């Protein structure tokens, strides 16, 4: 579903659905969004990215995020990553560095994403 958050058009992936860690599913979604006009930010629930997404050595996070960024999408991964980050220094560093940039963000929920967008774009 496409929503406007702090003036930005955001595609909010439903919680339920096929894994976006699957190449065909992710590519299909990218194709669909190219026809949606003006959507440049995807909010993806962590559950849709598969169990290996937060295990950096699996390569899933890199593959998924790089594909989306290559297609010029900003990505917000929605969900609690604190337990996984507490167990992995590299993951914690990756999340921290991602959140400092503008391409990939890890947010607890849509409200946190909206607050980040409002701060970034000066909209309340």
Where are these regions (language model features)?
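Amphipathic, Lys/Arg-enriched alpha-helical "gate/interface" segment within cytosolic domains
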Residues: 2-124
């Amino acid at each position: 579903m496409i929503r406007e958050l702090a003036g930005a058009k955001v595609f909010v992936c439903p919680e339920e659905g096929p894994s976006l860690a699957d190449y065909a599913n992710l590519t299909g979604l990218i194709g669909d969004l190219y026809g949606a006009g003006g959507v440049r930010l995807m909010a993806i629930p962590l559950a849709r990215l598969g169990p290996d997404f937060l295990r950096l050595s699996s390569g899933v996070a890199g593959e998924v995020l790089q594909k989306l960024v290559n297609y010029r999408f900003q990505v917000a991964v929605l969900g609690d990553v604190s337990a996984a980050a507490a167990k992995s220094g590299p993951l914690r560093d990756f999340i921290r560095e991602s959140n400092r940039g503008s391409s990939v963000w890890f947010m607890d929920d849509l409200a946190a994403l909206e607050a980040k967008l409002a701060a970034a774009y000066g909209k309340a």
